[in-house]
């Protein structure tokens, strides 16, 4: 179920303030955030946002195709190491 259009997109206020400050000062350092639930807005295009994945902050460069998606979609939380090898096949 998607969010109602009359409510608008959700973005944490502290993230929006940091992004506006970075745009105003033309700062190239990544904006560090733990807010994976925030939606990517058009104001974020061109910024690098460091999204926390539970262990570290993953730098995400925001492009125009990411607008409307959530930040957490671009910082994966699980690493797949592959299926364990079959012990019978080695013999």
UniProtKB/Swiss-Prot annotation:
One of its GO terms (molecular function) is structural constituent of ribosome. Signal peptide: none annotated. SUPFAM superfamilies: Ribosomal protein S19 (SSF54570). Keywords: Ribonucleoprotein, Ribosomal protein, RNA-binding, rRNA-binding. GO terms for biological process: ribosomal small subunit assembly; translation. GO terms for cellular component: cytoplasm; small ribosomal subunit. NCBIfam families: rpsS_bact. Protein S19 forms a complex with S13 that binds strongly to the 16S ribosomal RNA. Belongs to the universal ribosomal protein uS19 family. This is Small ribosomal subunit protein uS19. It comes from Delftia acidovorans (strain DSM 14801 / SPH-1). The lineage of its organism: Bacteria, Pseudomonadati, Pseudomonadota, Betaproteobacteria, Burkholderiales.
């Amino acid at each position: 179920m998607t969010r109602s259009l009359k409510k608008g997109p959700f973005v944490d206020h502290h993230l929006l303030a940091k992004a506006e400050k970075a745009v105003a000062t033309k700062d190239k350092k990544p904006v560090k955030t733990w807010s994976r639930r925030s939606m990517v807005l058009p104001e974020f295009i061109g910024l690098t946002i460091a999204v926390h994945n539970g262990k570290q902050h993953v730098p995400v460069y925001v492009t125009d195709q990411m607008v409307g998606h959530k930040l957490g979609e671009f910082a994966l939380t699980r690493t797949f190491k592959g299926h364990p090898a079959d012990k019978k096949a080695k013999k």
